[in-house]
Design a protein with these regions (language model features):
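C-terminal structural segment of proteins
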Residues: 1-274
């Protein structure tokens, strides 16, 4: 294993540019799992980002919450302003593993790990989060709902780092985060759901029911139009257009689809037309 330890962001970007197969390392919580499952992953070159102090804090502007590239789940949990304005971020952070994972794991790492069952990504997407990428060539911003192109595939080049995540500040009239797993804590989601309503409209984001975490535009349109929904089964045709669950070791496609329908029906029962 070869570990490179830059002191500044420019140094880190230079190292990524020079080492095309280098893997950025932040909290390391997901990488440790990969090392256990795939011992050959140790052979990579890693760029340890732990000295990049500028990427650690979260901050606020008049228009947005800014999560740094190294902001941890615990940073969000303990921030009172975030608890008030973006409670789903706190809800999701509290469900990411144990306290040790929450203390080390980063929001940017959760995005780049690209797990379809991630806890942090659905709520960021429901809040219209924007990924800020930087390389030696410059910066670009990518809406999180356009960041993934397929399973473990994303709009990030090997020489780019996520240096920030922008979360627009809006007035929300409704927001909920649901996670269904084998246990009440420290479980990987069988089904995840984040829903928000603001002046920008409805956002319905599903996890663990497709190759990527994704918005559900068909379900969103039902909410926007006040469609009549008398039971969870009425939602199944719309869900079928938005997601593509699979059978795996944690659950079945049939179970996931029907749990998602029940969550949507019961959580949003005040908004469905009669």
């Amino acid at each position: 294993m070869n570990v490179l330890l830059p002191d500044t962001l420019p140094q880190a970007l230079e190292l990524l540019s020079q080492n095309g197969d280098a893997v950025p390392m932040a909290g390391g919580t997901d990488l440790m799992v990969h090392w256990h499952v795939r011992p050959e992953a140790h052979q990579h070159t890693f760029v340890d980002l732990s000295r990049l102090e500028a990427l650690k804090p979260l901050s606020w502007t008049a228009d947005m919450l800014v999560l740094g590239g190294l902001t941890t789940y615990w940073d969000v949990i303990r921030d009172e302003r975030t608890r008030e304005e973006f409670p789903l971020l706190v809800d999701a952070a509290r469900q990411v593993g144990a306290i040790q994972i929450q203390a080390r794991g980063t929001w940017a790492g959760n995005i780049v790990n690209a797990s379809p069952a991630a806890d942090g990504v659905p709520v960021l997407m429901a809040y219209d989060g924007i990924v800020v990428l930087e390389s030696r060539r410059g910066r670009e911003q990518v809406p999180l709902d356009r960041f993934y192109s397929g399973y473990k595939q994303m709009r990030r080049r090997p020489d780019e780092l996520i240096v920030a995540i922008h979360v627009p500040r809006r007035r929300y009239s409704y927001q909920v985060f649901e996670k269904v797993g084998s246990r009440r804590a420290q479980a990987i989601a069988k089904v995840g759901l984040a829903v928000t309503r603001s002046d920008a409209g409805w956002r319905v984001v599903a996890a663990s029911v497709a190759p990527t975490i994704r918005r559900c535009p068909t379900v969103e349109r039902l909410l926007e139009t006040g469609a009549a929904v008398a039971s969870p089964s009425d939602l199944l045709p719309a869900i079928a257009q938005d997601v593509a669950p699979i059978d795996d070791i944690r659950s079945s496609a049939h179970y996931r689809t029907r749990v998602m329908a029940r969550l949507l029906y019961h959580d949003l029962r005040d908004f469905w037309g009669k």
